[in-house]
C-alpha cells in the first residue's frame, strides 16, 4: 500500500481504541510499538427492568466516554493531534449495534447479554433440530452467543426496533463509524455473530432466511487493516483528533491480541489469561470440530482461522479467592509494596506440585454445544492445617487453570491434528512466574512470556499503521514488534505428575456435573438455551 504521508519515524504515533467488557481505553503507541500514553474509563452495561439476562450497551454515554479517553490520551502523551497518523478500534466480540436507515445507532447490547435464552431453544428446533449444526459448520459458532437469537428476541419483543433496523455491526465498527461516518464490519469480529461464512469471510444471509429473519441488514465486510475513512469534523470536535486523520478497520480483541503477540502463522498457539482464559490455535484453513466443543473464528490475518477453547471465569476466580480469603495478605503486600498475587505466589511456591491432592471445581473445558459448568467447590480437602491452607488452595487454583488449559488445547488438537511446539502466555495471568511455570509443567511445552502482556491495543495499532500505509504487512509487523521477557521450560517429572492429576480431575468433574444435572447444585455458568 502506498503511504498516505511520509512521516518522520520519531514524530508520528498510532492510536488504538480498545473497547472491553468493563472499560474503554484510548492507547497511543509510537511506530516501534512502545506505549506512550493511555486514557481509560470504566463503563457499565444496562440491565433492562423485567428483561432477565439483558445487558444493553449505552450508545450515547459510551461514545462520550470514548471521546474523553481520546482527549485524555492526547493530553497524557503531550502530543498535538496532527501527529496521530491513524486510529483504529477493537472490541469485545459478540456485542452488536443496530442502525436505522439514516445511519443513527438505535440499539446495542454487550457481549454478556443473555436475554434470548428462549429464542436459542426455539432456533435449535429448526430443520428437525439441525439448524445449530448448520450454523456451526458454516460459521464456527453455536447459537448461545450469536446474534441470531438476539435479533429474534427483538422481533418478538421490540418490533419497533427490529422494523427500524437497517444495518448491523459490532462495537468496534460502531466506534469507527462514529469517527468517520463509514459503516463496515471486519471478519474477525463479525465472525462471532454466527452469520459470517468462515471460508469466504463474508456474510451467509441464508442463515437469517432459515431463521425467518431479515437478511437485508448486513453491512459491507472489509478486512482488518483496510482504510475505512477519515475523522469527520463533527467527531474531531468531540474527541480531539484532527479532521482527516485516517480511520482504519479494526477487529476482535482476541484476534488483534494475537497479532500484537506475533501469533500470526499456522499452528502458533496462545493462552490469553484474563477474566476468561482463551486457548487459541492458528489454523491454515477453515475446519470445524465434529464434536462442536470448540469455536472457530476468523483471524485478522486473511485466509487464517483460529480454533478457540475458553476457560470460564479463571481470572475472576483468582480475584474472588484473593478478596474473600486473603485480607491479611493484602495488608502485608501493601506494606511490602508488592502485588498481593506476588505474595500469594511466593507462599504457594512452598507447596509441593499437586497441592496435596486438592481439586478445584470451577471451569470445565469448553463444550460449545452444551456449555455449562459444575458448581464451584474444592474437593479432597484435608483438616491438616499444614497441608490445607491458603497457600495450598491458591496453588491448586493455579494448577487447575493450567489443567483446564491443557484439556482445551487437547480437544483442539483432536480435530485439527495440530500439536503446538510451544505456547505464548499473555494477559494478567502471565505476570505470575509460578503460574507461567505451572502452565509449562502441565502442558509439557515451553511457555514464552512477552514484554507487552496486554497486546490487544498493540495489535489494533498495528492494523492502524497498515491502513495508513506505514507498515506493509500486519503479520510481519506483529512478529517484528513483539519482544520476549522470559521463557519457562517444562519439568518432565512434574509433567508426569500433572498428567495423573488431570485424569483424576476430569473424572471428578464429570461426577460434579451430574449433581447439576440432578438439580442438587447450581452451575457456575450455563449458556442461554440450555
UniProtKB/Swiss-Prot annotation:
Recorded superkingdom: Bacteria
GO MF entries: autoinducer-2 kinase activity
Alphabetical keyword list: Cytoplasm, Kinase, Transferase
InterPro entries per the UniProt record, alphabetical: AI-2_kinase (IPR033676), ATPase_NBD (IPR043129), Carb_kinase_FGGY (IPR000577), FGGY_C (IPR018485), FGGY_Carb_Kinase (IPR050406), FGGY_N (IPR018484)
Catalytic activity, EC: 2.7.1.189
Compartments, record wording: Cytoplasm
UniProt xrefs under Pfam families: FGGY_C, FGGY_N
The keyword Transferase appears for this protein: yes
Catalytic reaction equation(s): (S)-4,5-dihydroxypentane-2,3-dione + ATP = (2S)-2-hydroxy-3,4-dioxopentyl phosphate + ADP + H(+)
Enzyme class: transferase
Signal peptide positions on this chain: none
Gene3D superfamilies reported in the protein's UniProt record: 3.30.420.40
Gene Ontology cellular-component annotations: cytoplasm
Gene Ontology annotations of biological process type: carbohydrate metabolic process; quorum sensing
Keyword Transmembrane attributed: no
UniProt-listed PANTHER family: AUTOINDUCER-2 KINASE, SUGAR KINASE
Xref: NCBIfam families: PRK10939.1
Family of this protein: Belongs to the FGGY kinase family.
Record's function text: Catalyzes the phosphorylation of autoinducer-2 (AI-2) to phospho-AI-2, which subsequently inactivates the transcriptional regulator LsrR and leads to the transcription of the lsr operon. Phosphorylates the ring-open form of (S)-4,5-dihydroxypentane-2,3-dione (DPD), which is the precursor to all AI-2 signaling molecules, at the C5 position.
Protein name: Autoinducer-2 kinase
Organism encoding this protein: Escherichia coli O157:H7
Higher taxonomy: Bacteria, Pseudomonadati, Pseudomonadota, Gammaproteobacteria, Enterobacterales
Amino acid at each position: 500500500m502506498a503511504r498516505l504521508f511520509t512521516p518522520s519515524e520519531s514524530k508520528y504515533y498510532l492510536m488504538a481504541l480498545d473497547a472491553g467488557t468493563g472499560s474503554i481505553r484510548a492507547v497511543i503507541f509510537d511506530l516501534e510499538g512502545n506505549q506512550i500514553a493511555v486514557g481509560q474509563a470504566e463503563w457499565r452495561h444496562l440491565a433492562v427492568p423485567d428483561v432477565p439476562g439483558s445487558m444493553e450497551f449505552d450508545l450515547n454515554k459510551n461514545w462520550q466516554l470514548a471521546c474523553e479517553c481520546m482527549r485524555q490520551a492526547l493530553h497524557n502523551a503531550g502530543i498535538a493531534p496532527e501527529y496521530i497518523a491513524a486510529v483504529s478500534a477493537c472490541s469485545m466480540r459478540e456485542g452488536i449495534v443496530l442502525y436505522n436507515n439514516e445511519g443513527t445507532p438505535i440499539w446495542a447490547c454487550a457481549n454478556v447479554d443473555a436475554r434470548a435464552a428462549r429464542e436459542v431453544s426455539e432456533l435449535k428446533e429448526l430443520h428437525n433440530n439441525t439448524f445449530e449444526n448448520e450454523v456451526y459448520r458454516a460459521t464456527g459458532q453455536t447459537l448461545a452467543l450469536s446474534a441470531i437469537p438476539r435479533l429474534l428476541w427483538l422481533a418478538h419483543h421490540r418490533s419497533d426496533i427490529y422494523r427500524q433496523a437497517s444495518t448491523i455491526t459490532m462495537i468496534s465498527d460502531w466506534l469507527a463509524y462514529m469517527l468517520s461516518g463509514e459503516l463496515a464490519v471486519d471478519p474477525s469480529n463479525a465472525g462471532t455473530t454466527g452469520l459470517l461464512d468462515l471460508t469466504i469471510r463474508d456474510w451467509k444471509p441464508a442463515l437469517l432466511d432459515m431463521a425467518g429473519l431479515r437478511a437485508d441488514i448486513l453491512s459491507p465486510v472489509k478486512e482488518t487493516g483496510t482504510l475505512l475513512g477519515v475523522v469527520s469534523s463533527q467527531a474531531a470536535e468531540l474527541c480531539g483528533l484532527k479532521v482527516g486523520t485516517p480511520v482504519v478497520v479494526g477487529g476482535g480483541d482476541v484476534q488483534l491480541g494475537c497479532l500484537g503477540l506475533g501469533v500470526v502463522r499456522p499452528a502458533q498457539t496462545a493462552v490469553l489469561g484474563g477474566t476468561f482464559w482463551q486457548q487459541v490455535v492458528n489454523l491454515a484453513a477453515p475446519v470445524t470440530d465434529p464434536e462442536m466443543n470448540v469455536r472457530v473464528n476468523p483471524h485478522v490475518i486473511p485466509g487464517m482461522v483460529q480454533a478457540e477453547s475458553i476457560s470460564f471465569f479463571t481470572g475472576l476466580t483468582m480475584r474472588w479467592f484473593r478478596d474473600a480469603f486473603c485480607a491479611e495478605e493484602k495488608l502485608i503486600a501493601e506494606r511490602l509494596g508488592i502485588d498481593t498475587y506476588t505474595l500469594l505466589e511466593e507462599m504457594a511456591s512452598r507447596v509441593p506440585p499437586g497441592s496435596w491432592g486438592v481439586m478445584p471445581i470451577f471451569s470445565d473445558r469448553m463444550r460449545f454445544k452444551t456449555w455449562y459448568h459444575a458448581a464451584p467447590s474444592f474437593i479432597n480437602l484435608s483438616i491438616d492445617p499444614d497441608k490445607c491452607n491458603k497457600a495450598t488452595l491458591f496453588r491448586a487454583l493455579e494448577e487447575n487453570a493450567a489443567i483446564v488449559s491443557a484439556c482445551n488445547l487437547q480437544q483442539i488438537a483432536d480435530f485439527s491434528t495440530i500439536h503446538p511446539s510451544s505456547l505464548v502466555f499473555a494477559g494478567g495471568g502471565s505476570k505470575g512466574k509460578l503460574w507461567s511455570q505451572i502452565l509449562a509443567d502441565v502442558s509439557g511445552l515451553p511457555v514464552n512470556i512477552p514484554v507487552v502482556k496486554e497486546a490487544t491495543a498493540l495489535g489494533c495499532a498495528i492494523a492502524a499503521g497498515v491502513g495508513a500505509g506505514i507498515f506493509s504487512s500486519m503479520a510481519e509487523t506483529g512478529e517484528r514488534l513483539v519482544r520476549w521477557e522470559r521463557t519457562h521450560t517444562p519439568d518432565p517429572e512434574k509433567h508426569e505428575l500433572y498428567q495423573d492429576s488431570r485424569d483424576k480431575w476430569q473424572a471428578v468433574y464429570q461426577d460434579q456435573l451430574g449433581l447439576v444435572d440432578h438439580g442438587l447444585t447450581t452451575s457456575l455458568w450455563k449458556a442461554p438455551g440450555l
